[in-house]
């Protein structure tokens, strides 16, 4: 089918890549902050027998970037996903979510458990545990959003690609780093700013108390150099003993970028096994 535009009930338009055999169940990929559906292109050849849905999340890529920051709330975006799946005639989905997309996957699975058959959660979190942590993060995200709007995308991307979270990307070949940078620059500054304030980790309700409600196969992925998210994944794994955890060598926060073939192999084997 290729890329299609799907309009949800309030008129917001989403860009969605729909590849592979037509089926009522699909693998759905949700990218991270500043990413796009292009982040997952490498999976086309690694999951050739699956219907693969890659979505530009709200405010990213070719999807609309509404001016109203409240439109970006996790609750609204979860509802958008349900509408998108309805229009694509998807009864069940296997969700792959990275970082921001992983938080969205957690929330969708909690809201529509009957529509999720598996979760692949890469370098992500069920949220921040305390109100104090959430308030602090909201303030940081507002400052970052102001920076984006004030100084523009180029200045923001130059800052963002050099934060400690992405330090391991400096080991990547220059052409790969250029591709990542170019993808980030194709975003909309209003969309990124509103994404930070509307569905940043601080704005999202904490789901830690509900993790044990998850009753589908779960694969947790993190890079060995990403100590923070490895610790989070270990904690989630203890709460979900039947989950599978993979700590990928020679990778940081963006495992699917730093070790794409190994990431694809791990995901393919997991999805085949369930």
Curated annotation (Swiss-Prot):
SUPFAM superfamilies: alpha/beta-Hydrolases. Its EC number is 4.2.99.20. GO terms for biological process: menaquinone biosynthetic process. Pfam families: Abhydrolase_1. Coiled coil: none annotated. Pathway: Quinol/quinone metabolism; 1,4-dihydroxy-2-naphthoate biosynthesis; 1,4-dihydroxy-2-naphthoate from chorismate: step 3/7; Quinol/quinone metabolism; menaquinone biosynthesis. One of its GO terms (cellular component) is membrane. Residues 26-259 form the AB hydrolase-1 domain. The keyword rRNA-binding does not apply. It catalyses: 5-enolpyruvoyl-6-hydroxy-2-succinyl-cyclohex-3-ene-1-carboxylate = (1R,6R)-6-hydroxy-2-succinyl-cyclohexa-2,4-diene-1-carboxylate + pyruvate. The keyword Acyltransferase does not apply. Keywords: Lyase, Menaquinone biosynthesis. GO terms for molecular function: 2-succinyl-6-hydroxy-2,4-cyclohexadiene-1-carboxylate synthase activity. HAMAP family: MenH. Catalyzes a proton abstraction reaction that results in 2,5-elimination of pyruvate from 2-succinyl-5-enolpyruvyl-6-hydroxy-3-cyclohexene-1-carboxylate (SEPHCHC) and the formation of 2-succinyl-6-hydroxy-2,4-cyclohexadiene-1-carboxylate (SHCHC). Monomer. Belongs to the AB hydrolase superfamily. MenH family. This is Putative 2-succinyl-6-hydroxy-2,4-cyclohexadiene-1-carboxylate synthase. It comes from Bacillus subtilis (strain 168). The gene is menH.
């Amino acid at each position: 089918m290729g890329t299609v535009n799907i309009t949800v009930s309030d008129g917001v338009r989403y860009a969605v890549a729909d590849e592979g055999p037509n089926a009522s169940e699909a693998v759905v990929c949700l990218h991270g902050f500043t990413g796009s559906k292009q982040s997952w292109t490498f999976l086309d050849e690694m999951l050739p027998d699956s219907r693969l849905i890659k979505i530009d999340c709200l405010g990213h890529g070719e999807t609309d970037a509404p001016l109203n920051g409240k439109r970006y709330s996790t609750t609204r975006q979860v509802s958008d996903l349900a509408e998108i799946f309805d229009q694509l005639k998807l009864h069940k989905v296997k969700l792959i979510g990275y970082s921001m997309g992983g938080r969205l996957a957690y929330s969708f699975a909690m809201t529509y458990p009957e529509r999720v058959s598996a979760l692949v959660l890469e370098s992500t979190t069920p949220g921040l545990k305390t109100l104090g942590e959430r308030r602090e993060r909201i303030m940081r995200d507002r400052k970052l959003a102001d920076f984006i709007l004030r100084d523009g995308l180029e200045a923001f991307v130059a800052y963002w690609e050099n934060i400690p979270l992405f330090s391991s990307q400096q080991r990547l070949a220059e052409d790969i780093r250029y591709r990542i940078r170019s993808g980030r620059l194709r975003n909309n500054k209003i969309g990124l700013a509103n994404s930070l304030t509307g569905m940043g980790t601080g704005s999202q309700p904490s789901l830690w108390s509900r993790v044990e409600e998850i009753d589908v196969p779960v694969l947790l992925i993190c890079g060995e150099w990403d100590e923070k998210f490895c610790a989070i994944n270990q904690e989630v794994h203890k709460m979900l003993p039947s989950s599978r955890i993979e700590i990928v060598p020679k990778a940081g926060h963006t495992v699917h970028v730093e070790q794409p073939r190994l990431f694809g192999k791990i995901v393919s084997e997991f999805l085949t096994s369930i």
